[in-house]
Amino acid sequence: MKLKNVFGLFIVAGLALGLAGCGGANKTVDKSSGAAEGGAKVVRIAHTQAYVPYDFVNDKGESDGFEVAVLQEVQKLLPQYKFEFVPTSDDDLLIGVESGKYDLGTKGAWLTEARKEKFIFPKEPVGASVIGLVYRKDNADQIKDIESFAKFSGKLVPIAPQNAQYNVIEAFNKTHADTPIKLVSSEAFTVADAYTWVLEGRYDAYIDIELSYKSNVEKETGSYHNLADKLSFVRYKAIPTYPVFNKKNQQLADDYDKAIQQLKDSGKIKELENKYFGEDLFQYCCPFCQQRLLW
């Protein structure tokens, strides 16, 4: 009888350990699926590492930038989530969000039809990216803005049809039928090609992202700073930028939209724009840009 009691104790203890082990396994699965202590869902946010001032890693090794700061403010309005920011490459960001490695990613991205097939785009943009014309300094007296460029010659470096910039020029031509810009479609080419073609006189302007021009040409360490005394840049419009969400995160995207609207209403977005850009970039967004721009 004593021996049977001993065996019985071992069996009971074994069952207890087994049940405890099962309970521990469930907790591990919950954490990996996004559950955090306190009931908040962990949201992994990928961002690029050197796209200053939109998304970057600062001198302290911290995630920083306008879009990161906006999302940090979004986090404050959504206590049901716990945001974790992960600096990474462009490719890993897009592949990771699509695969579910990350819940969302932010990289100063424009809305595109191709990306809409892979990701959820929220209704509210997180920021804006200014574009304009790069032209020869020799023509500074004739080219003051996009309208004067159109009258000067309208000879623009070709643009890929799927590029948002193509739609921008297309929209301009619809409202300037008498002096349209010569809009020619083309396959991809390098920035170096575009700058060279403008300097050679093959074309009279190239539509570029202002931040890229500043980094490439105006900055002393820029790859094409040697062209700074030959090229100039003039602003035109701003194109909205969006975070991209994994296809399974519609609720997160909806919650993001509500929070962004609150931040706009409170003036927080404008405050952060002034901090990182020194001005409100949304003021340069045209109605067409807000509604339909593809990249």
What are these model-predicted stretches?
Residues 84-149, 234:
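Acidic, polar ligand-binding/catalytic clefts
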Residues 29-109, 187:
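Extracytoplasmic small-molecule ligand-binding "clamshell" domains
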Residues 17-21:
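C-terminal motif of bacterial Sec signal peptides marking the signal peptidase cleavage site
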Residues 49-52, 61-76, 133-190, 210-212:
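Bilobed "Venus flytrap"/periplasmic-binding protein-like clamshell domains
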Residues 24, 81-84, 160-184, 258-295:
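Ligand-binding clefts/hinges and TM-proximal coupling segments of bilobed small-molecule sensing domains
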Residues 49, 127-132, 221-260, 279-295:
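Periplasmic-binding protein-like
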Residues 92, 108-118, 167-171, 199-237:
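A ligand-binding cleft/hinge motif common to bilobed small-molecule-binding domains
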Residues 68-78, 137-140, 147-151, 155-158, ...:
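Extended ligand-binding regions for polar small-molecule ligands
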